[in-house]
């Protein structure tokens, strides 16, 4: 037994590593327990089912992909942030092959409330960060946002465009950057 691998964070880290090496098919309660060096029961102490484990793993992958950049410059203006987000998506697709198209987007359509809730929580975090960038961007025109065209609505639009790019596996942000320039600068 490996007592250091029994934390929820370590179990999720191990699940991410299994996905990187073997894809989604490689993740099971048994395979994660084996890789952690713990009993199956230990995994069940944290996750009641494989679906719950996968849901939490999906959320942790989103967090891993969009971990806060150490380069604060990417959060000083909207254009830098959008470039960074698209780069993170591309890097995430390379680190977690098939994550976006085959599994993560499927959680939105899943019948499990927990899976949907975890995905929405991860997405809400990304949206909130984008709103903060928009609110702090000193380059934005004073009249850019109105009652009908709010920071939040624009952030949701940018996020929707990002998800669309994700499905298409098109990580060139140039069109979105031009939309940002024309809409708010």
Residue spans for each PLM region:
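Helix-turn-helix
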Residues: 10, 14, 18-52, 56
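Hydrophobic alpha-helical connector segments
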Residues: 56, 70-95, 151-155, 177
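Short hydrophobic clusters on alpha-helical segments that form packing/core surfaces
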Residues: 11-19, 61, 89, 162
């Amino acid at each position: 037994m490996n007592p250091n691998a029994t934390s929820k964070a370590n179990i999720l880290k191990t699940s991410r590593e299994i996905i990187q090496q073997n894809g989604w098919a490689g993740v099971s309660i048994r395979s994660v327990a084996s890789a952690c060096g713990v009993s199956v029961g230990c995994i069940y102490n944290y996750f009641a089912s494989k679906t719950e484990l996968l849901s939490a793993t999906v959320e942790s992958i989103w967090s891993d992909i969009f971990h806060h950049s150490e380069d604060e410059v990417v959060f000083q203006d909207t254009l830098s942030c959008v470039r960074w987000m698209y780069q993170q998506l591309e890097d995430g697709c390379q680190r977690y092959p098939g994550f976006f198209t085959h599994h993560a987007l499927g959680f939105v359509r899943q019948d499990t409330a927990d899976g949907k809730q975890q995905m929405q929580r991860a997405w809400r975090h990304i949206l909130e960060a984008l709103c903060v960038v928009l609110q702090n961007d000193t380059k934005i025109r004073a009249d850019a946002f109105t009652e009908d065209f709010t920071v939040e609505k624009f952030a949701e639009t940018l996020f929707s465009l990002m998800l669309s790019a994700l499905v298409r596996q098109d990580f060139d942000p140039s069109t979105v950057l031009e939309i940002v320039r024309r809409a708010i600068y």
